[in-house]
Amino acid sequence: TNDQGKIVEMPLAIQLKEFEIYEYPPKLMLVNGKTGDPIPKDKPATIVVDSTFKTGELQGWRIKLNKCIDEAAPLMTRDTTNYLPWHSSGAVTAINITATSPDGKVKKTGWVTCGSYHFPYQVLSLDGKISIAMPEREPQRYLSRIELMTQAGLHAFADIEVNSPLSVEGWKIYQLSYDTSMGRWSETSVLELVRDPWLPFVYAGLGMMMLGAVFMFLSLQRRKETKE
């Protein structure tokens, strides 16, 4: 829509073919078992569970990794909840760990997940007062794979990524956002289209200024050589 709220037909059409998010490795942290506040509250302590992680420590608790499933779904029985690989929309990152207290008297084993729009998160309760939780995984980069058609007859496929806009027929198409409630399973991509009709004149002006500087430099050099 324009400034008057009227619908304006764009000179190009965009169809989203695929949206991809690449996330940072999952993290584990301690939280208050009653309030859910991170521990420490001001500067939460975390450990990164990447491909090299085996053991770590959170506020004195020793954490041992038993299993990590990047895309999983819960399998619930009467007494337990297990996680199995599940490569479908809404899958969660599930980590099975064993946590041992600083004095070695308490040992807990269980699953921790960050949850998704489809499944709730799961924490591992340690001593009734604190639990181990997994915060939402942070996006490292995300991009849209699009099909583009213009009134001028252009038909192309392209990738648009944050800080890597697509330029086409005087337009710049930026990757702006996505449906954060769906996370990496988002089926919506937010793009921003920007057109500056004065941009070619700006570039032309800059080019003329650069040429003028070159000619001025050459002219000064010739005058200097003539005097010598």
Predicted regions and their residues:
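Solvent-exposed, non-transmembrane regions of integral membrane proteins
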Residues: T1-E228
